[in-house]
Design a protein with these regions (language model features):
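N-terminal secretory signal peptides
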Residues: 1-14, 18-28, 35
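Ligand-binding clefts/hinges and TM-proximal coupling segments of bilobed small-molecule sensing domains
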Residues: 40-51, 185-201, 238-242, 269-298
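Short helix-initiation/N-cap motifs at beta->coil->alpha
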Residues: 109-120, 199-213
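Periplasmic-binding protein-like
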Residues: 151-159, 227, 231-275, 292-298
Length: 298
């Protein structure tokens, strides 16, 4: 029995599919629309097909155009333009480039914006999708739709070395300052914490540098980013708060996803089908391993 057919995989698949059905259900209005001609797909990938994709013709329009416009916050290690080569790189970049091949989309055009500008940019029609690591929230779900889950990671807290800060929660930082990137769900947590002074940032490096310089008491952000920044900048006097208990639990709603306009149901369903294939073919595991994420992320 291969991995795809194993009981363990089927159990996990059922859980993820249940989460996806709950969080990104297809509106009934689109279900009633007449189905357009089936979009093209690359049949050379075993087991991948779009035979029952429903909705409008949003994928077909992109296929005819030959290009999908993706926005990213240029955030290592997720989705960024390499400073040396200009290549679209990172965990999400590799997932999306493979998905584009599966869906016969000839060109992926990447545009960088601040994190809090990605969803507004999609809603305004400047981008076809958010191609960066982003999570479900009830507020976002009111205006956009989400793809099938991709991978998981939690947040961590970073402070200046020898600061003496040893807390379990953000709320225990009362009387101190705490920062994160604007537009993230972490920013919502910090702003709701009584007595905690919130400071928002446009990029993770500036966030962590303020902690290292003493301008900010603590930073809460994605564990992979924090570890990477500390590894690449050993001169910064930083440490992870080992007593901090992450609020991000490993459940379907906390997996990273991609964001689309609600009306683009064919495109959403097609990308979800491609991501599902990447998950259960084992390709996702290989991508995550390449970027230093272990089995806990899959």
């Amino acid at each position: 029995m291969n991995e795809k057919d194993s009981p363990l995989t089927l159990t996990r698949r059922s859980a993820l599919m249940a989460g996806t059905a709950l969080l990104a259900a297809v509106p009934l209005g689109f279900m009633k629309n007449a189905q357009a001609a089936l979009p093209a797909f690359d049949a050379s990938y075993p087991g991948f097909a779009l035979a029952d994709i429903i909705g409008d013709d949003s994928l077909e329009r992109i296929q005819r155009k030959g290009e999908i416009i993706v926005c990213t916050s240029n955030d290592w290690p997720y989705s960024y333009l390499d400073a040396n080569t200009g290549a679209f790189s990172g965990i999400d970049a590799e997932i999306l480039l493979l998905a584009a091949k599966l869906l016969k989309i000839d060109k992926v055009t990447v545009q960088t914006v601040p994190f809090d500008g990605m969803v507004p940019g999609v809603l305004a029609g400047r981008f076809d999708m958010v191609g960066d690591s982003i999570h479900f929230s009830p507020e976002r779900a009111k205006v956009v739709d989400f793809s099938f889950p991709t991978y998981f990671y939690a947040e961590t807290m970073v402070v200046k070395k020898d600061s003496g800060i040893r807390v379990n929660t953000i709320e225990q930082l009362s009387g101190k300052s705490c920062g994160t990137l604007l537009g993230t769900h972490y920013s919502e947590w910090i702003q709701k914490a009584p007595g905690v002074q919130f400071k928002g940032y446009k990029d993770a490096e500036a966030l962590v540098q303020d902690v290292a310089s003493g301008r900010l008491d603590a930073a809460v952000y994605d564990l992979p980013v924090m570890v990477g920044l500390m590894k690449n900048n050993p001169q910064w006097p930083l440490e992870i708060v080992t007593t901090y208990q992450a609020r991000t639990l490993k459940i379907p709603s906390n997996y990273s996803r991609y964001i689309f306009k609600q009306k683009d149901q064919q495109l959403i369903n097609a990308f979800s089908r491609a991501i599902e294939w990447i998950q259960y073919s084992g390709q996702m595991r290989e991508i995550l391993k390449k970027w230093g994420l272990g089995e806990e992320a899959n």
